[in-house]
């Protein structure tokens, strides 16, 4: 890149970062950090462990956000200095270093710009994700497991902690369903664009005649419920069933009735959990998921009443992405038209570009 072009690119990045700072308001966040630090300093903070966890998690997230902004600002200033050296002394080494750093800065600032689009009521929350096999028999169950691995690898790439709450294995291969929590700030806002029906087209490895098979799996994304949401569920509204936890092929993984299934009688919503060690832990985990589902149900009802529910591409069951492995290889988002030919990379968790495109698409539809 020529020096003059590089200088303009850096000026544009500088302006983009300033716009991001205006949206994120770092000074307000620093004031909130100071308040949270005062709360953390209180000796009896951990007497209320749930509140303490909320305070410390929020503090860590804000500190990381401020550090990220300050680091980007410092790096842009460093590039300005390198460009001054390159212009004054025809320093090719400084120009090369500035070029490399500018490419990295563009990627990071673009990603941060997408983050500023996450301003929904629950976007800052952690996420509860459920994957279910749909039409397509054993291929659908196998596809559901492929999607589970994809999201686990995506979380791993970002350093996010994942807690698997429940896995229901199919008899021949794959899974009937799986539910997990992504413990990361803005996990809900980020992953909510993945909600919908995903379609796989391939030569079925389970078909002796090697025929092409189309199968489907559904992804549901909910925000983790917090204490301030006041989602109270009377015991009288619950039916609690206990059963043996099972593994692949229907194998029992323990000899006690530790797995728990909760049925919310007023709505008919059913949630199960079998991955914790005890019945008490499984019931608590299942209750968290049930609360998240009830919170989402209330939110959808409220939006419907306000006649503002935008269901295209976001609703459970709306087809949103196709994964074609035969006769060619292509993953395509049906809402944004973003597509990638490297299907192996996608199934290995390289889906940030799809998520970013989905977030931009959602914001555009919200503002149109």
Swiss-Prot record:
Residues with the N5-methylglutamine modification: 251
Annotated Gene3D superfamilies: 3.30.160.20, 3.30.70.1660, Release factor
Pfam families the UniProt entry points to: PCRF (PF03462), RF-1 (PF00472)
Mod. after translation: Methylated by PrmC. Methylation increases the termination efficiency of RF2.
Main location: cytoplasm
Residue ranges that the Swiss-Prot or TrEMBL entry lists as coiled coil: none
InterPro entries: PCRF, Pep_chain_release_fac_I, Pep_chain_release_fac_I_sf, PrfB
This protein's UniProt keywords: Cytoplasm, Methylation, Protein biosynthesis
SMART domains found in the cross-reference section: PCRF
GO molecular function, one term: translation release factor activity, codon specific
Subcellular location, record wording: Cytoplasm
GO cellular component, one term: cytoplasm
Tree of life domain: Bacteria
NCBIfam families cross-referenced by the UniProt entry: prfB (TIGR00020)
Assigned protein family: Belongs to the prokaryotic/mitochondrial release factor family.
Reported function: Peptide chain release factor 2 directs the termination of translation in response to the peptide chain termination codons UGA and UAA.
Name of the protein this chain belongs to: Peptide chain release factor 2
Protein encoded by which gene: prfB
